[in-house]
From Swiss-Prot:
Protein name: LexA repressor
Biased composition regions of type Basic and acidic residues, renumbered to the chain: 62-86
Site positions (Cleavage): 121-122
Lineage per the UniProt record: Bacteria, Bacillati, Actinomycetota, Actinomycetes, Mycobacteriales
HAMAP family, A to Z: LexA
Gene: lexA
Subunit details: Homodimer.
Region (Disordered): 62-107
Length: 232
């Protein structure tokens, strides 16, 4: 840190400068930071763990800030001025300058959501729990809490507008209210359904007449679906 309390650009390696440049470009062009994989491609880092390490170092140096009340939300701040002479990695590109503010002091909060495999919306399949990557989404859209993303497989939630191949953002919580869409674990397998409780018991309801309700007395609620995304 400099005497005025601001981060010291001299403490940055060439690669760290490139990472900050990539983040800045993405924020300027589309309003949110790049994914872990995009950062790695641009900075010449092959593994997501290497990118995560560099991001932690940048946080320690004061160039990134995480909000303790918003898990995985990152504020990008104090981005230093750089030129196009030093680029780490074969896929590096010149940063845009036209019409762009060159040094945003504080970007909107962004949640880096871990992608943890697929979730069944039909006949349940075993959910893959390995984190594949992190995907940046505006915190204003996905909200607070421990969040993760799962891909929907199957047609059982079709009539609710949740289609095969969609991505759902799930907020981890062990309980659900009547009518909420949830990710639930049943005998080691995961599925997304509507939570329903009545005199006959607890049920996970599909939104497709071709599928039957699932008795859920022994189901584990993994979380509430808070957002649905689709690639057109």
């Amino acid at each position: 840190m400099l005497p005025n309390g601001k981060p010291d650009p001299a403490s940055l390696s060439d690669r760290q400068r490139r990472i900050l440049e990539v983040i800045r470009d993405a924020v300027v062009l589309r309003g949110y930071p790049p994914s872990i994989r995009e950062i790695g491609d641009a900075a010449g880092l092959q593994s997501t763990s290497s990118v995560a390490y560099q991001l932690k170092e940048l946080e320690k140096k004061g160039f990134l800030r995480r909000d303790p009340n918003k898990p995985r939300a990152v504020d990008v701040r104090h981005l230093p001025e750089t030129d196009n002479r030093t680029k780490a990695g074969p896929k590096a590109k010149a940063r845009p300058t036209a019409g762009a503010s060159p040094q945003p002091e504080l970007a909107s909060s962004t949640s880096f959501i871990p992608v943890v495999g697929k979730i069944a919306a039909g006949s349940p399949i075993l959910a893959e729990q390995n984190i594949e990557e992190y995907y940046p989404l505006p915190a204003d859209i996905v909200g607070d809490g421990e969040l993760y993303m799962l891909q929907v497989v199957g047609e059982s939630m079709r009539d609710a507008g949740i289609l095969d191949g969609d991505w759902v953002v799930v907020r981890s919580q062990p309980v659900a209210e009547q009518g909420e869409f949830v990710a639930a674990m049943i005998e080691g397998e995961a599925t997304v359904k509507e939570f329903h409780k009545d005199a006959s018991g607890i049920w996970l309801l599909p939104h497709n007449d071709s599928f039957a309700p699932i008795p859920a007395e022994n189901a584990e609620i993994m979380g509430k679906v808070v957002s649905v995304m689709r690639k057109l």
